[in-house]
Regions:
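Generic recognition of short, well-ordered alpha-helical interface segments
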Residues: 15, 33, 37, 85-89
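Hydrophobic alpha-helical interaction segments
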Residues: 74-145
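Short, charge-rich amphipathic segments
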Residues: 16-28, 102-108
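Short beta-edge/loop segments at beta->alpha junctions of small alpha/beta modules
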Residues: 1-23
Length: 145
């Protein structure tokens, strides 16, 4: 049932991420927001990408939700291994931003967005990935004065 804006009295567009998660649950797919969408979900970018893409262990698929479409892009099992929850979101966002695109602002935004337990898990899991992402993960987890 669509949500209604009490002030405007009209129906709200469905939340794209909630819709994607519901589709993935129903299909028993594992999904991870890709690139620009991951950065947007974490507040690292205000830009909403024109194409909403999720990596999935399921087949390539496109689903229309209102006037928006969600693209599910099949990823190799190796590419999906270990990518779950906030860790997956952070890794995808960092890959999108690139090594040179991660500044103090992004580090601070992620420090705020992640709980202490999520920061510890990020550092632990990032050890096995790309070196620069591991270094960024350590900076995110550092205690600040």
């Amino acid at each position: 049932m669509p949500k209604v804006n009490p002030t405007l009295g009209g129906k709200l567009s469905p939340d794209i991420d909630e819709a994607a998660q519901a589709i993935a649950r129903r299909q028993r797919w594992k999904i991870v927001p890709e690139g620009a969408w991951a950065a947007n979900l974490l507040g690292l970018s205000t830009q909403v990408p024109a194409k909403i893409i999720y990596l999935t262990d399921g087949p390539n698929n496109e689903v229309l939700i209102g006037r928006r479409s969600i693209h599910f892009k099949h990823a190799r099992p190796k590419a999906m291994a270990g990518l779950e929850g906030k860790f997956a979101l952070v890794v995808q966002a960092l890959r999108y931003l690139g090594k040179e695109g991660v500044s103090t602002r992004e580090i601070q935004t992620l420090r705020t967005a992640l709980s202490p337990a999520e920061k510890r898990r990020l550092v632990k899991d990032a050890r096995f990935g790309v070196d620069w992402i591991y270094e960024v993960a350590k900076r995110i987890a550092e205690k600040t004065a």
